[in-house]
Every structure is written in structure tokens, then in C-alpha cells.
UniProtKB/Swiss-Prot annotation:
It holds the Pfam family Ribosomal_S21e. InterPro entries: Ribosomal_eS21, Ribosomal_eS21_CS, Ribosomal_eS21_sf. Keywords: Acetylation, Cytoplasm, Endoplasmic reticulum, Isopeptide bond, Ribonucleoprotein, Ribosomal protein, Ubl conjugation. It is found in: Cytoplasm, Cytosol; Cytoplasm; Rough endoplasmic reticulum. GO terms for molecular function: structural constituent of ribosome. Its main location: cytoplasm. Gene3D superfamilies: 3.30.1230.20. Component of the small ribosomal subunit. The ribosome is a large ribonucleoprotein complex responsible for the synthesis of proteins in the cell. GO terms for biological process: translation. This is Small ribosomal subunit protein eS21. Belongs to the eukaryotic ribosomal protein eS21 family. Component of the 40S small ribosomal subunit. The keyword Ribonucleoprotein applies.
Amino acid sequence: MQNDAGEFVDLYVPRKCSASNRIIGAKDHASIQMNVAEVDKVTGRFNGQFKTYAICGAIRRMGESDDSILRLAKSDGIVSQNF
């Protein structure tokens, strides 16, 4: 679909689970989206950037969401590797 400026735009872009790469459906009311703020290492203040993680309801239902978020945070460098 095109807008008035002639650019191609999508009507709906589905979210994907950060842990399993599954598409999060519109009726998945158990899914969460979490923003983790990045802070300056010296001052400890918010620097205006954040990482976004989306976890689908199936992962939460299995009880694997905490491990998945920790694994994703380690890979992004938010949590130290030896935690």
C-alpha cells in the first residue's frame, strides 16, 4: 500500500518474540514487551537509549521468560557474561 507521498507502507507489522522468533498474534494477551534502559557507566544516568524485548505468551506459559530475558540481556551486553 502507498501513502500520499508515494512511499510504500505496511498496514500492520506484527511483533516477533525475541526469544523464540515466533510472531506474536493480536490475541496473545499473555505476551509482554519490556524496555530496558541503557545507562552511562560513569554517571549511572539514563542516556536516552533502550533495548526492547518482546516475550510471547507460550514462553511465559512454560516458565522460561526469566531465563530468556537473561540470555538476551547477556548477548546485548546489558548483563555481564559471568552472572
